[in-house]
């Protein structure tokens, strides 16, 4: 019997959990009287290919993971089960997130590409398919630019330059009898290819209106040019009363009093709609899981936490919720946060691994990783100023934190930088956007930095953090 999508995931989860190695890694000697140890070099313990297998599961088996959706929940369970199988105490921290409006396109191309898209909230949202031939119309902001042939068809437009422009495209298509409208974006906000989006309509429409990524819209244009026609089926879903989850794993020192200093290694595991999110940010999550494996049997005088945040792409919701719910005493316990986001791209212009803070200042985390880079004779690791990830809420709460990301920076003032063109798109997949060498370097540098902080006596680490 053919397995359903959910059954395949559950089977894979169970198989993956049962396959976890129980071999001790970097374990302290039983007769050691000290609370800190000399751990073997982290570089010999971490494996980029093993981390990328987590990336593969998240980005291919599960796929796009918009915040609060079922696919994000599957991802949280995968991460939690992996961490629990390593012996960590695992907690799922729920929090509310905004509604999601997700569109789905079935076509002859559906098997080769991802066709999850954004749906306009005030367009037709229906599980019943709207099926019709596709027609491409250039421009369309003027009614006389819309041919009568659009009647009864689904219209594909290059998205107008402004919200007002694409609203005119939609209204003109409706006036000519279109059964659906697909708007595809050409360029993203950071020089990347256009990503999926939820069109903001000024008028309620009785037909489906979807926002597509450039790769999706361009594929349809090519299909029409090659075959002359293609039939699409459009469905949409409004998901409400949503909850996302932070996955929090802890390993306390022996004879813990509950007041020990803590070190956090974090990432977010969600993605935007329509994007498999291999680099953004299954790569960070794969790194977190691989470092958790490497540190699972290491004994120190500190608590170590591995946290996978939900719904980062919706506005850092998971990390903000986590920090907001920490007492001042809990905040004071945290020595530093090593946050991994987009750590394995193969994009050649993203040539440096940066340790970024929101204000550009250095702290215990940046110092530890820059020192680690020196130990490893790695001159590609630099320090810089950047927000837009889960290190920000910690930094604003006075907790030393840094973002680790591959980027190319031409200028800091004004800020001119390079990230991969396939960021937030259906092309953010392992084949097109993941480098094992970049993943290994991130594992080595971040892992060595974490190890150095863990090995330092707590008092010395406190002084460094102050």
Region spans (language model):
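Sec-dependent signal peptide cleavage junction
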Residues: 20-35
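Metal-dependent peptidase/peptidase-like ectodomains
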Residues: 299-300, 309-408, 412-413
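His/Asp/Glu-rich mid-to-C-terminal helical/loop segments that flank catalytic regions of hydrolases
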Residues: 413-466
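Noncatalytic luminal/extracellular "stalk/propeptide" segments of secretory-pathway proteins
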Residues: 44-49, 53-154
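Soluble metallo-hydrolase cores and metallopeptidase-like ectodomains found primarily
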Residues: 117-144, 198-278, 293, 297, ...
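Catalytic-core environment of secreted peptidases
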Residues: 35-37, 48-63, 82-89, 154-160, ...
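N-terminal capping segment at the start of a domain
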Residues: 33-70, 86, 93-95, 100, ...
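Extracellular/luminal Protease-associated
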Residues: 69, 115-208, 380
